[in-house]
Amino acid sequence: MNPLHADKPHPTVQWLDDDGATQQADWRSLAGHPPPAKVVLAGDDLGADAAYRLLSAGTGVLWLGDYQNARHLLQALGRRLDKRQARPTQAAASPTADLKAAFFSQRAAQAERARILGGVLLPFDADHGVPLRRAPDVRAAGLQAHGPVTSHYVQSLRELLGVVGAFEWRRKGVPIPALDAAIHPHHGVYSPVRGEYVDLVAQAPLSVAAHAHGAFDIGTGTGVLAAVLARRGLAVVATDLSPAALACAADNARRLGLPRQIVLKSADLFPPGQAGLIVCNPPWVPAPAGSSLEAAVYDPDSRMLRGFLAGL
């Protein structure tokens, strides 16, 4: 079995059914969020105001009604949160303090939004199907994200939408003009949708040392920079700590016909040895990441950037 999809023990969620009996299912969150401490059943008669009160209090809502109505509920909750977060706040004492306060206020609002919207839950069968009226067939997307499972489970609707979106990104790929091909991001791996940094690597002059001693790609992610350098004739060692990123980079190297030019290593920044060229597209916001995907953007205390500079 792929270690990325090893079916490890999961937390569980419990609720009372219509007869008052306790029911239980595995809880699955690819982002690593804990399950709600309390879960209640809900259906098409639950309005957005009542749902908002439950979710704000930390109660998860396990939806058993029409799937499309669950999506409408999620959209209505999002609009309520947008209105609340648009209210003006008290100005800070200085411009610097104002920027800092605004940043952390936005982060707190994003976390609260994610918590509330993440409380709308769906049941899943062991084949990753959603046993609700008008539910789409998401079994292939679920299998790709979770791997095989052995029992039914509960997951948030919001995360399911992310799983389906990632499935489509991976299937279609992201066009990379510098490669004249597509890169296929996996779930939880940052997608190279903005290509300015890719173009810089594609157009930068390569030194004699780079051709002689190869290149390191630190924090390779999808492997897009490693692929660009390999296409330019360099031997590349690409590193990452994320198993999902390494699997994604290996998949892209294979798709592009570059598995021999790119060596992938699990490492915290630098691999052993030296290289004639080192590239890195580090996270740039010095704040905690809320998920594996955000780790491509948020770098607590600039840990990766400091480590990269110290290791040069």
Task: List each model region and its residues.
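N-terminal auxiliary segments of SAM/dcSAM-dependent transferases
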Residues: N2-G32, P36-V174
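Charged catalytic carboxylate motif
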Residues: E112, I116, C248, M304-G307
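Short amphipathic alpha-helical segments and helix-helix/interface helices
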Residues: L117-G118, A202, L309-L312
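SAM-dependent Rossmann-like transferase core, predominantly class I methyltransferases
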Residues: P136-V228
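A short, flexible beta-alpha/helix-coil linker loop
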Residues: I183, A289-S292
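Residue-level signal for the nucleotide or nucleotide-sugar donor/cofactor binding architecture
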Residues: P192, A244, D299-R303
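Conserved SAM/SAH cofactor-binding pocket of Class I
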Residues: R194-P282, P286, G290
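Glycine-rich S-adenosyl-L-methionine
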Residues: S292-L312
